[in-house]
C-alpha cells in the first residue's frame, strides 16, 4: 500500500486488521502479556520470534516417545527420530526457494558458517580476501577473522569491509558492485548478510552473486535476518551457500537449530574439503561403523552429529504455519505493515529521531531501525517496561519489526503512540 492510503487514526488500524485475511495467523501464537495484563506490543521478532501455540504439544509428543520407547524412539516413535530432520526439508526448501537436496537443518549459525568456510574459503597468495559488511554482526566478524588466521593470513590485510559513504547510514548498491569489480580478483569469499542486523538494509543478493561470480569469487550469505523475512530465491540467484538461524523470524525458540543451503552444483563434489561427522555419512552404510567417511550427496553431507529432536519439533510447529501462510503473501503483508509503521513515524516530523533503514520496500525487510537523538537508550527501556517490546543496539539505534505472522496494524499504532510519549 502507498502511504497515501494510510491515515493516522486508531480506527484505521483496527479496520485494516479486520479486513486483512492474513491477520488470522496472529491467533496461532502466544503473545506475551504487558504489565497491565493486556497483550504486549511485540515488535522484536527480529531478535526472538514468538511461540506457536502448537509447540507444547509437539514437544510433549517427543517427550512421551522418549518416556515410553527409550532408544526405540529413533525407529518406532510417532515421528521416528532417525529421519526427523527430513520432516523439515521440504518446508525449508520452499521457504528459501531451493531444491530439497540443497538444504539441511543442523547445528547453529556460527558453527555452520565455520563448516561452510572450511569447504568454500580456499585462500591463495593471490586471492585470499574475504568481503563482509563493516557493520556485520560480531559473531560473523569473529568467525571470518578466525578463519583468515587459521589459514595463515592476517585480517588486517585479508579482510575487506563494505562501509557506507560518509554521512550515510546504509550502503549504496552501486558502491557494493563497484568494489566487487575493483577488488574481485583478490577476493576468495564474499560473505554478506541478506539483511543487515543493525540498519535493516536488505542487499540485492542476485546482483551481488552475479557480480561476484564474474570475478571468480565464492558468494555466500548469512540469512539470519532474511530467512522468514524476505522472499528468497537462493537456487535461482545462483548463491554458492547460505546459513541462517531459526529463532528470529522462523520462531523456532531460543537457541534453536540452524539451517544451511549448498547449491546443487556441489552436491556430488566429494573432493571438497570438509569437516566430517557420522550424521553426514552415507545413511545406507552409516551403521556399519566403517573407518572411512563417505558423505551423503547434497547439503546433508555437511552434517556432523544427530540433531536435537526437541529444537526441531519446535521449529516444525512454526514451519507448518509458514507453509500454510506462504512466504509470498507474508512478504506482501510485511511491506504493507512496515510501510504503515514508517508512515506513522514520519507524521511526527520530529528531530529527535530518524529512520535509517532504506525507504524502498525492496531494500528492507520487516525491520525499521530508528536512530534516537543523543543515544537515549532510556526510551527503549521505558517502552519495554510498558509492554511495547523493541530492542536497542549501541550507540543509538532502536530496532522494531512488525513481523507479518503475528503483528497487527494496531500494534504499529500503539507503538508509535508510546514511542512519541516517551520521547517527549
UniProtKB/Swiss-Prot annotation:
GO CC term, one of those recorded: cytoplasm
Q: Which SUPFAM superfamilies match?
A: PLP-dependent transferases
Q: Mention any Pfam family matching this sequence.
A: KYNU_C
Q: Which biological processes are named by the entry's GO terms?
A: anthranilate metabolic process; L-kynurenine catabolic process; L-tryptophan catabolic process to kynurenine; NAD biosynthetic process; quinolinate biosynthetic process
Protein residues bound to pyridoxal 5'-phosphate: 109-110, 137-140, 222, 225, 247, 278, 306
Keyword Calcium in the entry? The reply is no
Show the catalytic activity.
L-kynurenine + H2O = anthranilate + L-alanine + H(+); 3-hydroxy-L-kynurenine + H2O = 3-hydroxyanthranilate + L-alanine + H(+)
The UniProt keywords, alphabetically, are: Hydrolase, Pyridine nucleotide biosynthesis, Pyridoxal phosphate
Fetch the Gene3D superfamilies from UniProt: Aspartate Aminotransferase, domain 1 (3.90.1150.10), Type I PLP-dependent aspartate aminotransferase-like (Major domain) (3.40.640.10)
Obligatory cofactor(s)? pyridoxal 5'-phosphate
Give the pathway listed in the UniProt entry for this protein.
Answer: Amino-acid degradation; L-kynurenine degradation; L-alanine and anthranilate from L-kynurenine: step 1/1; Cofactor biosynthesis; NAD(+) biosynthesis; quinolinate from L-kynurenine: step 2/3
Instruction: Return the InterPro entries for the record.
Output: Kynureninase, PyrdxlP-dep_Trfase, PyrdxlP-dep_Trfase_major, PyrdxlP-dep_Trfase_small
MF (Gene Ontology): kynureninase activity; pyridoxal phosphate binding
Location of N6-(pyridoxal phosphate)lysine modifications: 248
Please describe what this protein does. Answer: Catalyzes the cleavage of L-kynurenine (L-Kyn) and L-3-hydroxykynurenine (L-3OHKyn) into anthranilic acid (AA) and 3-hydroxyanthranilic acid (3-OHAA), respectively.
Family (UniProt): Belongs to the kynureninase family.
Q: Record's HAMAP family?
A: Kynureninase (MF_01970)
Which proteins does it associate with, and in what oligomeric form? Answer: Homodimer.
Spell out the protein name for this chain.
Kynureninase
Q: Which organism is it from?
A: Koribacter versatilis (strain Ellin345)
Traced from the root, the source organism's taxonomic lineage reads: Bacteria, Pseudomonadati, Acidobacteriota, Terriglobia, Terriglobales
